Each structure stands twice: as C-alpha cells, then as structure tokens.
C-alpha cells in the first residue's frame, strides 16, 4: 500500500466533514467494530453516518444517532474493501471520551480503523488480510506506533 499526504492510494476515498486539525504525533491505532443498523452488514449506512447523510427514516435506530458527528480514518467492509474518510494527517472523531496509558483524548494522537462487524461475531478473513496490510503501512509511515 502507498500513502500520500495521509491518503492511502488503494482505498476508496469518501471525504467526511467530521474532522479537525491534528496537533499531536501519531503513536496509536484504535480498532473499532461498527454495523448499521446494529448487526446488519452490506449497506452504505456506515458511509452515510460518517458523511452526515444518514436518513433517520431508513431505520428506527437511526433516529437515535442522527445528530452524531463522527468519523473514522478507515473502514474495512466484510468483503475486505478499504474505505478512507479522513486523512491520517487530520484528526478523525472516532474515539470519543478516551484515554490510553493515562493520556486522554485518543483522537489527538491515533488513527481510527473501523471493521464492519460486531463485538460478538467473527470478522472475515478478507478483513483481517486488509487490516494487516493497512497497519503495516501505517506503522512504516508513523514509526511511533508500536505493537502492543
């Protein structure tokens, strides 16, 4: 994989408005799981959430989250498709109130990767394969990220 100005060339780019300037060095990758609606896969609902285009009429659950302004740097779909929403040079809004090793605000110094799925279901081999390539690329670009 190639990264240029914070963008992975092999990723499908969908630019989210939900980001701001990053003022800290990157030293962490945060991996989340997401599905919208919960436990449902294979739609554009996650994209629409990160792009502020989620339609609250499409599912009752969406009425609860319609006002969220969130994003992630990356999404890896069940099929292994890699999407990027925010440049790694910018701060995505993926971690909310958070801390790592006593340092608050993980968004300030981390890259967020979403895997389409849930905490109680298995991920797909294609997702793991893509995740390995992506994390290797990011760790090469940002050497302060350590395996932990």
What does each of the following model-derived ranges do?
Residues 1-22, 28, 33-144:
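Active-site-adjacent loop/helix surface patches within enzyme catalytic domains
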